């Protein structure tokens, strides 16, 4: 599987947030960006990961980082997810999976013993110059947010 590499310029994107406002990577680069791709709102692993990132929100802020989650869900789904789980991370809509493809976070993966196409749970730390500092592919949701925080 092809992957992005540390030291590369992070691919720019323009996606809508849960309020329908378009946001690009460049809009976020006043801080380090923790960009995480996840498969679907309101599913067990994705909920755990989002809640963990939200619980550590102030710790990420202390390290001058903003946390942004991206999935193929629409704005309405994100709004519901944010409300139900009391999330404080930014969620962006990648319904056509263009951003996931740019970040090599969409492709073949195993689910319940079968291979299928889908979002590959991945996280990227991007510095204020837009350069990839860390790339995590095929991550497990449990404990991942803490691991990312420790990597900053």
Curated annotation (Swiss-Prot):
Residues 4-152 form the Thioredoxin domain. The keyword Disulfide bond applies. One of its GO terms (molecular function) is thioredoxin peroxidase activity. Disulfide bonds join 46-85. SUPFAM superfamilies: Thioredoxin-like. InterPro entries: AhpC/TSA, Peroxiredoxin_AhpC-typ, Peroxiredoxin_BCP/PrxQ, Thioredoxin-like_sf, Thioredoxin_domain. Monomer. This is Putative peroxiredoxin bcp. It comes from Helicobacter pylori (strain ATCC 700392 / 26695) (Campylobacter pylori). The lineage of its organism: Bacteria, Pseudomonadati, Campylobacterota, Epsilonproteobacteria, Campylobacterales.
């Amino acid at each position: 599987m092809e992957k992005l590499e540390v030291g590369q310029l992070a691919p720019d994107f323009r996606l809508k947030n849960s309020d329908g406002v378009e946001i690009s990577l460049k809009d976020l680069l006043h801080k380090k960006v923790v960009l995480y791709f996840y498969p679907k709102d309101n599913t067990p692993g994705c909920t755990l990961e989002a809640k963990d990132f939200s619980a550590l929100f102030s710790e990420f802020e202390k390290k001058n980082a903003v946390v942004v989650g991206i999935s193929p869900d629409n704005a309405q789904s994100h709004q519901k997810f944010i409300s139900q789980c009391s999330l404080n991370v930014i969620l962006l809509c990648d319904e056509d999976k263009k951003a996931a493809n740019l970040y090599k976070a969409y492709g073949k993966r195993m689910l319940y013993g079968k291979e299928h196409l889908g979002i590959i749970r991945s996280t990227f730390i991007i510095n204020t110059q837009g350069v990839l500092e860390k790339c995590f592919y095929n991550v497990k949701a449990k404990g991942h947010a803490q691991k990312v925080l420790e990597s900053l």
